[in-house]
Design a protein with these regions (language model features):
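Carbohydrate-associated surface elements
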Residues: 163, 184
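A short, well-ordered alpha-helix in the C-terminal region of glycosyltransferases
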Residues: 337, 344-358, 367-370
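Nucleotide-activated donor-binding/catalytic signature segment of Leloir-type glycosyltransferases, i.e.
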Residues: 246-264
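Short hydrophobic beta-strand element within catalytic cores of glycosyltransferases
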Residues: 292, 301-304, 314
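Conserved acidic donor-binding segment of nucleotide-sugar-dependent glycosyltransferases
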Residues: 316-317, 321-328, 337-342
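Aromatic "clamp/platform" in nucleotide-sugar-dependent glycosyltransferases that forms part
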Residues: 284
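Membrane-proximal helix-turn-helix segments that form the acceptor-binding/catalytic region
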Residues: 136-157
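Conserved donor-binding/catalytic core segment of Leloir-type glycosyltransferases
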Residues: 158, 194-221, 234
Length: 384
């Protein structure tokens, strides 16, 4: 039997806007976050529909973990179609609330439809968009992000990190409209593997995109192997930059030490983390950096860049080490330190396990449910 909603006692009809669904080959941490939350809301008795972009071989409609997914055009047509598709959806099958998931191009739903709206914000791109997509798309994204404070003057928002909240406030969103709720973790799946020493395997996880800066990890591996000759690197993920990264590996003569796995199922990712001596995240910006917490839960400390999102998920010196962004030498030094200093490593592993135990998808779902009720109750009041 489905659980009843915890906050209002009434089942809500929810429409979610997010470019990708969980089956999209480009799905990442944002999509995991969306489905972990909304599948729980479905279990509590709510109905959830997601309007997402299509991709090669995708069915126009499907149901994933109880969430009904309707796919529109491809990623390039999707944002132009959303205003019309949303209005048609609401006209034929009304909803109690629309949830904008803000991590790519903003939807600006309050200007599109007269319906209660709230938002889940992973991160906004700002100028990092110019290092991920073509200039015209990046410019349009940056300009559209400037409209968010005007469209969402009184929209209840859930930010997944203090860094994201600070970015929203700096852009003009009222602090009282934002609650910070970090992602959760499946503690039943993410756990340490067999005890014993781990080989010096370094794992890097993420989409192979420019702003993720996997090239910095590859360059650092050259220095790391001078101190730890048997250090190896597994790069997990897919993306447009793979060819460029593979060429860099060849130029640095690291073919025998670097593995590109492509996209792999979650169970295999967990196996890598349970074997890893170290996780590295070199991204220029993250909403939170959930892979860091997943690694902590599997007994792998991390070295990450000191940037928004990652400085929220890493407790420097307690669960991992933070280094300056794109600093190859600093990354190499920190990685060698974790790989060779056993007392430090033991302290980071213990701190990481304790830290990871604090993250709960149920709490994140509770907060989302409360935000939805707030959006419905406050609709029509105007800015506060």
């Amino acid at each position: 039997m489905a659980q009843r909603p915890r906050h209002a006692g009434k089942a809500r009809r929810i429409v979610v806007l997010n470019e990708r669904d969980l089956e999209n080959p480009l799905a990442g941490g944002a999509e995991i976050h969306v489905f972990e939350i909304f599948r729980r809301l479905v279990e509590r008795g709510h109905s959830v529909r997601l309007l997402a972009a299509s991709f090669r071989g995708a069915a126009p409609t499907t149901t994933i973990q109880g969430v009904v997914v309707r796919r529109l055009g491809n990623r390039y047509r999707y944002y132009a179609q959303i205003p019309f598709a949303l209005r048609r959806t609401l006209a034929t099958d009304p909803a109690d609330v629309v949830v904008d998931v803000l991590n790519k191009f903003p939807f600006l739903t309050p200007w599109v439809a007269d319906v209660p709206c709230c938002a889940i914000v992973h991160h906004l791109f700002g100028t990092t968009a110019f290092r991920q997509v073509a200039f015209p798309i990046a410019l349009a994204t940056v300009l559209a992000e400037k409209l968010i404070p005007f469209a969402h003057q009184s929209t209840p928002m859930l930010a997944i990190s203090d860094s994201t909240r600070a970015d929203l406030v700096a852009r003009g969103i009222a602090a009282e409209h934002i609650v910070v709720v970090p992602p959760g973790l499946d503690v039943g799946a993410y756990a340490p593997g067999p005890r014993g020493p781990r080989s010096p395997l370094i794992v890097w996880i993420g989409r192979l995109e420019g702003y993720k800066r996997a090239d910095v990890m590859i360059e650092a591996l050259v220095e790391i192997r001078r101190r730890v000759p048997d250090a190896r690197l597994s790069i997990i993920g897919s993306g447009q930059a793979r060819g460029t990264l593979e060429e860099l590996v060849r130029r640095r003569r690291l073919e025998a030490a670097v593995e590109f796995t492509g996209f792999i199922p979650e169970a295999r990712k967990i196996e890598y983390l349970q074997r890893a001596a170290l996780l590295v995240n070199t991204s220029e910006k993250e909403g939170f950096g959930l892979t860091v917490i997943e690694a902590n839960a599997c007994g792998a400390p991390n070295v990450s860049t000191d940037v928004p999102g990652l400085r929220d998920s890493v407790r420097d010196g307690e669960t991992g080490l933070l280094v300056p962004f794109a600093d190859v030498a600093a990354l190499a030094r920190a990685a060698v330190q974790v790989l060779t200093d056993e007392p430090l490593r033991a302290r980071l592993v213990a701190g990481g396990l304790e830290w990871a135990a604090r993250f709960s998808w149920d709490r994140a779902a509770d907060a989302t449910e409360a935000m939805i009720e707030d959006a419905i109750a406050s609709h029509g009041r105007g800015p506060s």
